[in-house]
């Protein structure tokens, strides 16, 4: 027991005027006053710790909640028809047919990944994996969305090295394939990288588990790793003191607020959980992530039909002298909290013993309505659990379109110098291919295991990851994540829809049917009205887009305060789309050359759209104007045609067009298939626009000559624009833009793949 005096509920009642460090814990004056109003007294030290972490921006969504409700308002009953769990649960769950369900979610671990890149990224992966485990599923794949400062900035190498090793080290050790994602370099992320991790899990529909504590007398069991000092206050400012200072005269060094992960403990925990689920030993379950036991106990109790009592001294600790507040606030990793009936406790413990997982009964469900916590026989917490978990402050922050937005939009690319000659076009292609914005991410992805477990069908560098779920039928899923901070900065509403459209298209390109969306909304300070305008517009754009496409948002995450000083990051709404494919054997790959003499057909309209483009960034360091037009009805039509083409075997390869335009897509497809091709520019087309425009809603498909008439006839009949843009020449070792230039595959590969190893290898 800590030598620190215990602040009990009795003591708090008797000493109402004791000064408390609520501001140091991130609480405002009015929030502290509200806590005292709820309790009818001042909070104890332990209660104050609980409220401070649970009412933090990260846990309470206090600045975003008024806007996030728009997702629910725009979701129809039809959209919800295949959704088994949605917003408010640990992760969304979707019925994918044949008795299977898939759960998926994106979470952020941004700030810890700057302070301690390896552990920040590793525990970001570990945390999202436990969210998936808590739904009753076996985790089957991970993805990541990474944002770093300028590639040549002094500190970027440190952050990139740690984050990539952290993502790979944790995911690889768990035996989870990393099937895709994005990595972006931009100076706005210097000092504030983004690490957004996605995990997907699969289960039978009847195996779904939810987080609630029900049934008076049922036991609360904490199992997994011991509880330590690492991660205290990771979601608030509980660890705001300097890391090397002495803490409270205890003689202990204060550890950073970044958690420390052990993937091998988590791997065993996964198998233990799955056996517990199979044996029907779990009533309710919650992982311990942000806010630790404060979150797990209050959320379980708030979602149940009674109260809860916890004997906090029963929590297994790996540090001596911890206080009750520290135990409640610790974010030590690899821990779960389960609700178990008394007659199943012994069987539960036997399963944990089999897997060498430490498990301890720390409390029970009560027939009251309060969450009480004792510490060595004295009550240190006595609260209504909903006030901790769900009834925190809600702010309607000022929303104001920035005055600078007009100038940003007016600053178009119209006056920028464009390449005209064949040599200039070739030089532009090679410069863009070699740029950190577009170069190969192979140096990163090769540090991840993409095919472990044997169910990965497509992974990086495909447009989406495709994973088999059912070995017997071949049923599987496709996952894609996308975001564009540049487009969102120009128009947050359109930028969010462009990210949605691309992720939707990336799933459709593989032959899968898009079914559901998760998101991770990364923005600057909510106290800035301009940032809140960006956030509001992005939420509305994403919600309206999902409604138009008929797919629901099943959950997500909001990360605010992503800025250095007063300069926010580019607004970055990350969108993840889950698709279903009834047989992974009919998936459409990216690489050319599967069929000799394939015809290359470009689907969709190409317009002169360069505002916010990678070309404007790489060639001119420019950001301004209006982002490309979004046509979600066209995206749906495109998806329908790709699905039909996949089922009928009409296309042998497909790759979506996005950053870098047609030129980038052709090079990636040619290198993936190790096959050259000829690009035939339309006579009336501007070569620069054709090659580098970033118009949305376009896909390059390779069609066997025997199927060309059927495929183009289907497109014409459904009013989808198409143009025959090239041919795959058997045995060709170059990409030729007829009438302009030719580049060998060897030069393209060297140019494309050499940048990141030179910078970070």
Curated annotation (Swiss-Prot):
Sequence similarity: Belongs to the FGAMS family.
Organism listed in the record: Rhodococcus jostii (strain RHA1)
HAMAP family xrefs: PurL_2
Compartments, as annotated in UniProt: Cytoplasm
Catalysed reactions, semicolon-separated: N(2)-formyl-N(1)-(5-phospho-beta-D-ribosyl)glycinamide + L-glutamine + ATP + H2O = 2-formamido-N(1)-(5-O-phospho-beta-D-ribosyl)acetamidine + L-glutamate + ADP + phosphate + H(+)
Nucleotide-binding is among the record's keywords: yes
Binding-site list for Mg(2+) 1: 107, 557
Binding-site list for substrate: 108-111, 130, 259, 331-333, 559
One GO CC term, this protein: cytoplasm
Biological or metabolic pathway of the protein: Purine metabolism; IMP biosynthesis via de novo pathway; 5-amino-1-(5-phospho-D-ribosyl)imidazole from N(2)-formyl-N(1)-(5-phospho-D-ribosyl)glycinamide: step 1/2
Enzyme Commission number(s) from the entry: 6.3.5.3
Biological classification of the source: Bacteria, Bacillati, Actinomycetota, Actinomycetes, Mycobacteriales
Residues where ATP binds: 61, 105, 519, 556
GO terms for biological process, alphabetical: 'de novo' IMP biosynthetic process
General function of this protein: Part of the phosphoribosylformylglycinamidine synthase complex involved in the purines biosynthetic pathway. Catalyzes the ATP-dependent conversion of formylglycinamide ribonucleotide (FGAR) and glutamine to yield formylglycinamidine ribonucleotide (FGAM) and glutamate. The FGAM synthase complex is composed of three subunits. PurQ produces an ammonia molecule by converting glutamine to glutamate. PurL transfers the ammonia molecule to FGAR to form FGAM in an ATP-dependent manner.
Record-linked SUPFAM superfamilies: PurM C-terminal domain-like, PurM N-terminal domain-like
An example Gene Ontology molecular-function term: ATP binding
Key word Hydrolase present: no
Protein name, as recorded: Phosphoribosylformylglycinamidine synthase subunit PurL
Main location (coarse class): cytoplasm
Quaternary data: Monomer. Part of the FGAM synthase complex composed of 1 PurL, 1 PurQ and 2 PurS subunits.
Residues that coordinate or bind Mg(2+) 2: 131, 287
Pfam families, alphabetized: AIRS, AIRS_C, FGAR-AT_linker
């Amino acid at each position: 027991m800590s030598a620190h005096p215990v602040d009990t509920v009795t003591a708090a009642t008797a000493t109402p005027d004791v000064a408390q460090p609520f501001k140091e814990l991130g609480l405002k004056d009015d929030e502290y006053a509200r806590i005292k109003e709820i309790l009818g007294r001042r909070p104890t030290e332990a209660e104050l710790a609980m409220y401070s972490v649970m009412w933090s921006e990260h846990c309470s969504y206090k600045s975003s909640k008024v806007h996030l409700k728009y997702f629910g308002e725009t979701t129809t009953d039809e959209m919800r028809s295949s959704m088994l769990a949605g917003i408010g649960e640990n992760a969304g769950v979707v019925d994918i047919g044949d008795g299977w369900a898939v759960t998926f979610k994106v979470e952020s671990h941004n700030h810890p990944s700057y302070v301690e890149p390896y552990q920040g990224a590793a525990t970001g992966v570990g945390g999202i994996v436990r969210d998936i485990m808590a739904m009753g599923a076996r985790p089957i794949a991970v993805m990541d969305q990474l944002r770093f400062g300028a590639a040549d900035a002094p500190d970027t190498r440190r952050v990139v090295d740690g984050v990539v090793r952290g993502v790979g080290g944790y995911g690889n050790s768990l035996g989870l394939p990393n099937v895709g994602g994005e990595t972006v370099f931009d100076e706005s992320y210097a000092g504030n990288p983004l690490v957004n991790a996605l995990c997907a899990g699969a289960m039978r529909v009847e195996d779904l588990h939810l987080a609630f504590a029900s049934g008076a007398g049922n036991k609360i069991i904490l199992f997994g790793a011991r509880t330590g000092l690492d991660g205290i206050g990771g979601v608030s400012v509980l660890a705001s003191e300097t890391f090397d200072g002495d803490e409270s005269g205890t003689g202990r060094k204060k550890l950073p607020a970044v958690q420390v992960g052990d993937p091998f403990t988590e791997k065993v925990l996964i198998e233990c959980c799955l056996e517990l689920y199979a044996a029907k030993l779990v009533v309710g379950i919650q992982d311990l992530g942000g806010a630790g036991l404060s979150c797990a106990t209050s959320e379980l109790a708030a979602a149940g039909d009674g109260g809860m009592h916890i004997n906090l001294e029963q929590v297994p600790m790996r540090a001596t002298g911890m206080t009750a507040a520290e135990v409640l606030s610790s974010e030590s990793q690899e821990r779960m909290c389960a609700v178990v009936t008394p007659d199943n406790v012994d069987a539960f413990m036997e399963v944990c013993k089999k897997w060498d997982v430490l498990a301890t009964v720390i409390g029970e469900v009560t027939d009251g309505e309060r969450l009480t916590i004792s510490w060595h026989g004295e009550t240190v917490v006595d609260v209504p659990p909903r006030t901790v978990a769900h009834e925190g402050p809600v702010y309607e922050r000022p929303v104001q379109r920035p005055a600078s937005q007009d100038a940003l939009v007016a600053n178009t690319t119209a006056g920028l110098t464009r390449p005209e000659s064949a040599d200039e076009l070739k030089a532009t292609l090679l410069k863009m291919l070699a740029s950190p914005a577009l170069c190969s991410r192979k140096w990163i992805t090769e540090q991840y295991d993409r095919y472990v477990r044997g169910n990965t069908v497509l992974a990086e560098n495909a447009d989406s990851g495709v994973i088999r779920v059912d070995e017997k039928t071949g049923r599987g899923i496709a996952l894609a994540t996308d975001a564009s901070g540049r487009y969102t900065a120009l128009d947050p509403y359109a930028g969010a829809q462009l990210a949605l459209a691309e992720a939707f298209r990336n799933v459709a390109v593989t032959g899968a049917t898009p079914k559901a969306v998760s998101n991770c909304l990364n923005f600057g300070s909510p106290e800035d009205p301009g940032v809140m305008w960006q956030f509001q517009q992005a939420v509305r754009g994403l919600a309206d887009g999902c409604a138009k496409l008929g797919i629901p948002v099943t959950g997500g995450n909001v990360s605010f305060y992503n800025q250095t000083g007063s300069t926010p990051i580019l607004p970055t709404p990350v969108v993840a789309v889950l698709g279903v494919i009834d047989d992974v054997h009919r998936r459409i790959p990216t690489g050319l050359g599967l069929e000799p003499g394939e015809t290359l057909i470009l689907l969709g309209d190409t317009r002169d759209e360069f505002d916010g483009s990678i070309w404007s960034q790489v060639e001119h360091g420019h950001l301004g104007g209006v982002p490309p037009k979004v046509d979600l009805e066209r995206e749906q039509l495109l998806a329908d045609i790709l699905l039909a083409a996949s089922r009928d075997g009409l296309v042998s390869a497909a790759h979506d067009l996005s950053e870098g335009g047609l030129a980038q897509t052709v090079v990636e497809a040619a290198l993936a298939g190790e096959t050259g091709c000829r690009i035939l520019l339309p006579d009336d087309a501007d070569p620069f626009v054709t090659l580098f425009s970033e118009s949305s809603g376009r896909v390059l498909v390779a069609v066997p000559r025997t199927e060309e008439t059927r495929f183009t006839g289907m497109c014409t009949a459904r009013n989808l624009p198409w143009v025959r843009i090239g041919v795959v020449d058997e045995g060709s070792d170059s990409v030729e833009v007829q009438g302009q230039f030719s580049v060998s595959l060897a030069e393209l590969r060297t140019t494309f793949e050499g940048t990141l190893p030179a910078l970070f290898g």
